[in-house]
Amino acid sequence: ISGNEGSNNISVRGSNQWGNLILLDEAMVYNPNHALSFFSVFNNDAIQQVSLYKSYFPLKYGGRTSSVIDVKMREGNNQEKHRSATIGVIASKIQLEGPIKKGKTSYLVAGRFAYPGAVLNVLKQFRGTKMSFYDVNAKINSTLNDRNRIFFSVYNGGDHTFFNQLVRG
């Protein structure tokens, strides 16, 4: 497994990024990157587990030649409510989770808004650059019995990028 400098894409056994199957809660992710491939679309506050299969991956993942990255979202706390928020230099996040029906059904909502363009504007050659992106993950999870559960998972994200003419010197 290798990566490329200045990019979030990975290469497994020499393949390009299209040789990898990337899933989020069993749904295919076609572009796992934000902001010209510098940032991942996966908000770590919403992720429970990541499984990487480099070879001999299970048949249910067929259709790709290189690897499978299977990402599972957290299910939310089904016992009590939790809230958190962070404000950072290039990103801010919020997370809400709790029970809908205690012990049985839960929800999770995690959002992230990043503004790396604010940092780029400090550099003379990037003045006037506008770059931001957002992610929202939401999930409702319900345990039907000891062997079965049902869930509804949503991801929404977007990028906003504008490069003013680069200043040289």
What role is predicted for each listed range?
Residues 1-58, 68, 74-75:
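Periplasmic N-terminal accessory/gating domains of Gram-negative outer-membrane beta-barrel systems
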Residues 3-5, 78, 102, 147:
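A cross-taxa feature marking solvent-exposed loop/turn segments within ectodomains of secreted
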Residues 4-6, 16, 79, 90, ...:
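Residues that act as N-cap/strand-start positions at coil-to-secondary-structure junctions
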Residues 11-14, 94-95, 163:
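Short, solvent-exposed polar/charged micro-motifs at secondary-structure junctions
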Residues 21, 49-60, 66-74, 81-128, ...:
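Predominantly transmembrane beta-strands of Gram-negative outer membrane beta-barrel pores used
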Residues 30, 115-117, 158-160:
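Feature marks short, surface-exposed loop/turn motifs that line or immediately flank catalytic pockets
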Residues 33-36, 118-124, 163-166:
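Short acidic, glycine/proline-rich loop/turn micro-motifs
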Residues 149-169:
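Flexible loop and strand-edge segments within Gram-negative outer membrane beta-barrel domains
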